[in-house]
């Protein structure tokens, strides 16, 4: 172990240009203890050497160091060094040093009872400990002591410097990971008040001069402070984990070594194998000049028991140290367990000494970052105070972006108080001087405000005026005059002039001059007991201005209020106590009771049962520095405020229109929390209240409140007749700023209605006045002067019943606010009366209805009478326009359907509605199918008219030939979107397709135009008058017309008196005669008219969406005839889905889309093998009457004989998604087979069938097999909503059927048909069979049969794929059931359809 002199920096002692090698940071590790083997021997020798030289060192400080021969040599045990060059050089360098003798590691002697101090002096530095051996680890080595004494002031030799360098080399060469880090709980700072390796006596140490010390475990080595003057200046702050204090000495002027922050610290460790190795370190005092005091031996602390409490005590000692320099402080806290406990050093720019930041007076490292030049206490008289870096005085805030994203802006400071408190305290916020009146309590009466200008500004009743003393019955001065009357005449005269003061004698219950009763000595604890200790109270966090997540109990709040010390500032401002024991002990001021509108108009029977707004008594409990930001009391109510304890400071902003606008903008601003509203309005007044003061705050005044000290306040809110206009204005602001309902005045609207009823009840309008106003809209009731002048000499004395009678005095402020009250209640009456009012939801309408009390008559009639009452009382003015008879009734009213409440109904209501709708639709369909043909003809005949034939190839222009019923205006002119399924958000404006593509939607406008101007629905022929039955019947009639082929048979002129038409006339008539047909514009060749353009889909209702079918219901669950007429939307490509072979019998798979097909039923091909084309009217009759076999025989004969040439369907033109095209190819009709028989496919599923879900197309693959393809709404569909739809047209000439080979010569791209009706064309007089395209499916492979059963039996394979020559044969062979009796089939199909539609259905899957 080297002596302490090796660390002394001697100026000029080193060779010229000699540079001490600096080990890299993190490479220097603490010196390890030597082995235990020969520690005892070595310590004994050191003690002998020290005892022999101690006196000499003390007396001759300049003597030479002991020679190497004086130091007993011992070998290095346990240093298993590697053969590195650095180790070799270091060993050689150490060998040249006479004092750097290898230390033997010996355990402590049992006879040694000297202890080392655990708490070293503050001014003593520390010495570097011995180097730790590589191979051994012995905790007892930390107590080793040096035996060599040395002179403090003598300059060291060159060998000392070289020895230091060698030690550095050794430290550099030593590994840094020999031992794991030792917990800080075992770290100890020990005394090092000795400079040699012996335990010195107190007398020896007293005579020594203390200088700079270094900590090596618990030993200090003295350094010469005077030798530091030539060291280069260096003022750096560095992090140290304590190992720096072990690795390098604290030499004045040099930077402390902080490179070993990751090395294990020196600490006293327990030995598991020995229990007697507890080293009691003697507590040694600070060496100040030459005096050191030792602690008693019995005051030792075992090193093994030292832990965290010891460190805390050391920290406290260091914090409380009066020493200015850590060069003399050995309370070195060197935590190294983690970086959070690192100790920061700072250097003095004056003396260049290093200090721990705590010793320098800094709390943490963050404070040192602002230091420019640090000056220790010793240097301050010479160098001045510590300087800091320049910091801007501008206020900066750190934004909590997470909170800001949620709309909550929090204060960035660490202060517990609100961020406005400090500026207010420092008067940084300027306020205008206030001159609000201070009034005596006897002057504050209702009469004062009613007969004046009302209560327009805050009023303060000082505590010195509002006492509890009784008022004497007479004036003391008058009593003195009476007693001093010299004569009887004078006495009588005084009695005659006795002041007529009417004093009310009341029971003394502790009331003050305002007649307000509040228990004296009320405290927060008492409030807690009276209200209920376990009752909940809402607590406000002042800093965030938001309520706590959970309500506190009154017990918890009382404990918080009475607690002292730093705490989060919280406030209670919404504790209403009227229904508690405390509420029965309080009485409001008389002025408040007289002006309270609620007390005047609320029914007594409701008050008796406790059903009234409870806002009369609020107990406000605030700790110091509470702050409530600017607000207006709910409903524009007025406030009374009495300070029981503490102080309050108000900041008032008058309720001018510009200020209210600023207030509304401020409330909606995201920077509300950090924007002082007073700075925005430029008009803000400050009012300070003390204990006992009472304040009245008028309606609408914007105010904030600061609590300078703990306070207890009793207050309350009340509405008045004097502030109708302001109260209603504030209520509207609350609505605009979206104030939650729980923070609004309860039953505000109901109180206003009760006020109106009170006016009309106590002072009814005479009949003569009502008649005069009703007869003449310009009538004015003449008054000589306003009625608010009628007091005193002008008091009203007219008898009751007179037009000029007043039941009471009406103030000017009250009369001026009545028009605002009438307008406000008129709107509520219109809403309750189901009139159209903008921006009113169903929930709002229901709430308004509940807010209107029971009254004689309708609310609209009552408010109309009140309008006349206002004109009568105000006088000399006309009544409002809306009071005229019939004006209100002329406004639009909601329809019966629109009166239904919005929002998603409950599951139970949904089920009930679905069951009722399903039952009604079933009944309607069953009645329609069972009605005899005669009845239907009787019902429909009176309304039918012949339709004039149109010109050839010209589209129909009107539908005047069909009786048009009177439809709901909303249904015909306004698009009705389906319910979104939830009550959240506005209704969708765009269709789903455009909304998903995020483009502007024009489909709703087109749909509106089409439905409003061109769509006419014929329901008069149904014979049923119930809405559900009519809807169901209408849908069935339309679909029945589609099922019939949607064309006209040539020669069926006997039906309903219709003459035989040519092809174009039949086409036009087929559209016009369709019950739900759609008229087309002139020049529009598409049968769909406007519907041929791309359109999005409205969202289906819940029932249809769950059952996965196209929805034709409106938003109220009824069948929408317009939706029933719309064409279905394309779903998927022809290869999307293929039904399984065994599922071909699934009846509903063919009828999946009816939206567009029912709109234009004529644009549908009909297969000659199944049915003959006939008019939709005829088909409808045949469906309704069940007579399906009357006309097909006639048509078959016509087909056999041949018909005029007409346009036939080509294979590529069956898709409704294709534009209309005319085909010129002719087909010989003589080749048509004569086996075409009855129109079996004449029945369709109801509008809610599966026909609106999938499109089934029969296709022929390469092998000739027929494959049914199911189309679903897939985005991969070729004919998507983004592409124009193409629909076939009809030409007057007839396509003659050719051979199968000829049909293959017209290859066309396969196009899908969305529905059986959409891909089918009608040829008058011709039963056009389907043509087969050899290797490609025909374009008429759509769902050609509107009856699923018939389609699967007759069309799916045979008709659509067989050529004309093989048509009948293929139909016979594959579907022999096509000749089933149509009557039985129709009845069976209806039942089957209903089972599919309203029961559980099985969808066709993939093949």
UniProtKB/Swiss-Prot annotation:
Function, in words: Histone demethylase that specifically demethylates 'Lys-36' of histone H3, thereby playing a central role in histone code.
Cross-referenced SUPFAM superfamilies: Clavaminate synthase-like (SSF51197), FYVE/PHD zinc finger (SSF57903)
Record field: catalytic activity: N(6),N(6)-dimethyl-L-lysyl(36)-[histone H3] + 2 2-oxoglutarate + 2 O2 = L-lysyl(36)-[histone H3] + 2 formaldehyde + 2 succinate + 2 CO2
Keyword vocabulary terms for this entry: Chromatin regulator, Dioxygenase, Iron, Metal-binding, Nucleus, Oxidoreductase, Transcription, Transcription regulation, Zinc, Zinc-finger
Top-level lineage group: Eukaryota
Record field: compositional bias (Basic and acidic residues): 55-67, 125-140, 896-914, 928-938, 1254-1264, 1285-1296
CDD domains: GAL4, PHD_TCF19_like
Biased composition (Low complexity): 1273-1284, 1297-1349
EC code: 1.14.11.27
Biased composition (Polar residues): 141-150, 1008-1027
Keyword Metal-binding in record: yes
Major enzyme class: oxidoreductase
Cofactor: Fe(2+)
GO molecular function: DNA-binding transcription factor activity, RNA polymerase II-specific; histone demethylase activity; histone H3K36me/H3K36me2 demethylase activity; transcription coregulator activity; zinc ion binding
Region (Disordered): 1-86, 98-151, 893-987, 1004-1027, 1122-1183, 1252-1389
GO CC annotations, alphabetized: nucleus
Residues in PHD-type zinc fingers: 323-382
GO biological process: one example: chromatin remodeling
Entry keyword annotation includes Zinc: yes
Cofactor note (record): Binds 1 Fe(2+) ion per subunit.
Domain comment quoted from the record: The JmjC domain mediates the demethylation activity.
Family: Belongs to the JHDM1 histone demethylase family.
Positions of the JmjC domain: 577-735
Entry's localization field: Nucleus
Major subcellular location class: nucleus
Descriptive protein name: JmjC domain-containing histone demethylation protein 1
